[in-house]
């Protein structure tokens, strides 16, 4: 039996601006996205029918799981009716703004491309992923990218290599992505907004590879919706700054926040300051230039 095992990287937003509402009711976005080395492990094995298992109680095992949707999209595209067993080992916090569900789905697309010997290109996998969720095309490739449209129109940026950060999330808190966007739309969105000058400033800072230039330019429109409703997220963001982070921001729709650091030692020092807080998930992470990494592909007669 053939087995494929992959590492599916988390994503952070260095920039997220909501420009307006599209005719298809999605939001028009400008984002700068970055993969980090916090990752789930996704294992795929041939099976008569598709099933998914995960030890995390909040991860569904039905077709509401984007990983199952990824199988269905590939089956429809290729005409293959085989099933697959999907085992997800979660390290990325669930419902946290780190694209955990999307990156698992991206791993399923990439893994089935190997398991079923499909020969699809990365661009084809991205196009299929866009049918499932807006973050999935980025998760397929990973790295550092400018994302526009609803997030699926990607332009690679100069690789942001070896940047350390601290990810922090209150363990018992989840924020609905749909709620965050709808709240922003209702309370803050004005039609015809043009991208702010800080977009180009951040792109220049990313190209410079200087974390000290990037940190003050972090921006996320969704903080305006989420932080007033979840003051504990705002407090955690401020705690990262007071602990010494160069800059801190909520990722995506939250509630995970991250703080940028000068180097690994600095990140570990910031993490140590927060380590005593109860109910807090903390990770020292580093940027990486891949979304999905193949760990293992093997065949067995068992």
Swiss-Prot record:
Its EC number is 2.7.1.148. One of its GO terms (molecular function) is 4-(cytidine 5'-diphospho)-2-C-methyl-D-erythritol kinase activity. Keywords: ATP-binding, Isoprene biosynthesis, Kinase, Nucleotide-binding, Transferase. The active site is at residues 11, 135. ATP binds at residues 93-103. Pathway: Isoprenoid biosynthesis; isopentenyl diphosphate biosynthesis via DXP pathway; isopentenyl diphosphate from 1-deoxy-D-xylulose 5-phosphate: step 3/6. One of its GO terms (biological process) is isopentenyl diphosphate biosynthetic process, methylerythritol 4-phosphate pathway. It is an enzyme of class 2 (transferase). It catalyses: 4-CDP-2-C-methyl-D-erythritol + ATP = 4-CDP-2-C-methyl-D-erythritol 2-phosphate + ADP + H(+). SUPFAM superfamilies: GHMP Kinase, C-terminal domain, Ribosomal protein S5 domain 2-like. Pfam families: GHMP_kinases_C (PF08544), GHMP_kinases_N (PF00288). NCBIfam families: ispE. Catalyzes the phosphorylation of the position 2 hydroxy group of 4-diphosphocytidyl-2C-methyl-D-erythritol. Belongs to the GHMP kinase family. IspE subfamily. This is 4-diphosphocytidyl-2-C-methyl-D-erythritol kinase.
